[in-house]
Amino acid sequence: MEENKINIFYESLEKSLSVEKSELLFNHIMAGDFSDIKLSAILSTIRSRGETVDEIIGATKAMRKHSKKIISDENIN
């Protein structure tokens, strides 16, 4: 797992990521696996080169997996 995390970290700094690689990266981010400095480097790099559709989809999938489901009896419009 550690090697996988390191590989995806460096890959995210070098080039745009596929949906699968982006989801893997954001799973690590959501799990708190990166230091603040590494997280800053990742997000700054992705932002400076411009997020791709694949990166956004992968990030969304990861965030949905890590989100908490809320059940309510109220009807919310």
Regions found by a protein language model. Give the residues of each.
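Acidic, glycine/proline-rich low-complexity segments that act as flexible tails and inter-domain linkers
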Residues: M1-N77
